[in-house]
Amino acid sequence: MGSFSIWHWLIVLVIVMLIFGTKKLRNVGQDLGGAVKGFKDGMKEANADKPAEEAQPTQQVGGHTIDVEVKEKTKS
């Protein structure tokens, strides 16, 4: 009683097709597939950019210390 059998799902599918029609369901499926594809492409682009950022050499700081005194700017 807790789970649905395949027959329950087939009846639900037939009712949904009768209500919305196959054309509407096909359009929804295409839109959903396009959204998933766009998300995957975006993730690939984000992962492709990440190694490029890591490959940039960092500036090596020598053993010299620079002592700087900061003065506050007053409003006139």
Curated annotation (Swiss-Prot):
GO biological process terms held by the UniProt record: protein transport by the Tat complex
Keywords per UniProt: Cell inner membrane, Cell membrane, Membrane, Protein transport, Translocation, Transmembrane, Transmembrane helix, Transport
Ranges for region Disordered: 47-76
Keyword Membrane among record annotations: yes
One Pfam family in the UniProt entry: TatA_B_E
Domain of life: Bacteria
Membrane topology category: Single-pass membrane protein
Record Gene3D superfamilies: 1.20.5.3310
Keyword check for Membrane: yes
One GO molecular-function entry: protein transmembrane transporter activity
Recorded GO CC terms: TAT protein transport complex
Transmembrane regions listed in the UniProt entry: 1-21
Biased composition (Basic and acidic residues): 66-76
Protein's cellular compartments: Cell inner membrane
Subunit structure and binding partners: The Tat system comprises two distinct complexes: a TatABC complex, containing multiple copies of TatA, TatB and TatC subunits, and a separate TatA complex, containing only TatA subunits. Substrates initially bind to the TatABC complex, which probably triggers association of the separate TatA complex to form the active translocon.
Function: Part of the twin-arginine translocation (Tat) system that transports large folded proteins containing a characteristic twin-arginine motif in their signal peptide across membranes. TatA could form the protein-conducting channel of the Tat system.
Family: Belongs to the TatA/E family.
Name of the protein described by the UniProt record: Sec-independent protein translocase protein TatA
Species of the source: Dechloromonas aromatica (strain RCB)
Lineage, highest ranks first: Bacteria, Pseudomonadati, Pseudomonadota, Betaproteobacteria, Rhodocyclales
